[in-house]
């Protein structure tokens, strides 16, 4: 895994590295969490949004790393050899993740460009979601 030992050993942290999120839900675990942090690879957040949000308490903070290379179409990703540099694709894929979150009771609070680029140099985005507070205008056109 990639988590620092200090995080892994913290008794307040439940780690689900190398776990298929499709098999997880608040119901299957019989618990939900105050903070949910999501960093997925090779899968769209949209396909598992219901699972992600089901893991969060009603007043939880949910932080998702949006990786446009996994949200874009296969054609878009293959055209650019997996490195998405098109601003329109960034905005569209972020918007699609936001809509998916909204469909499952998640409300966008904030978004930033990740200070750490993806391995191949992809621009990635950290999204803060809440179930408790109303959605905020993220001004995506100013972000990218």
Show where each model-derived region lies.
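S-adenosyl-L-methionine
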Residues: 1-47
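Residue-level signal for inorganic ion chemistry
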Residues: 3, 67, 121
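Short "lid" loop at the C-terminus of a central beta-strand within the Rossmann-like core
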Residues: 21-22, 68-72, 115-116
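A short glycine-rich, Lys/Arg-flanked "PGG" loop and its adjoining helix->strand segment in the class I
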Residues: 46-63
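Short, glycine-/aromatic-enriched active-site segment of Class I SAM-dependent methyltransferases
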Residues: 68-85
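Short alpha-helix
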Residues: 90-104
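Conserved S-adenosyl-L-methionine
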Residues: 106-115
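Flexible, glycine-/basic-rich loop-and-beta segments that form/coincide
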Residues: 123, 130-144
């Amino acid at each position: 895994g990639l988590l620092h030992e200090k995080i892994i050993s913290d008794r307040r942290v439940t780690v689900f590295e190398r776990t298929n999120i499709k098999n997880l839900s608040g119901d299957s675990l019989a618990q939900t969490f105050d903070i949910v942090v999501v960093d997925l690879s090779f899968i769209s957040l949209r396909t598992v949004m219901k699972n992600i949000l089901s893991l969060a308490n009603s007043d939880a903070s949910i932080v998702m790393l949006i990786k446009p290379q996994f949200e874009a179409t296969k054609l878009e990703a293959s055209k650019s050899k997996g490195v998405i540099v098109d601003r329109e694709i960034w905005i569209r894929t972020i918007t699609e993740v936001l809509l998916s979150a909204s469909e499952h009771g998640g409300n966008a609070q904030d978004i930033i460009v990740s200070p750490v680029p993806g391995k191949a140099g992809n621009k990635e985005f950290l999204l803060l979601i809440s179930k408790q507070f109303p959605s905020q205008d993220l001004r995506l056109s100013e972000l990218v």
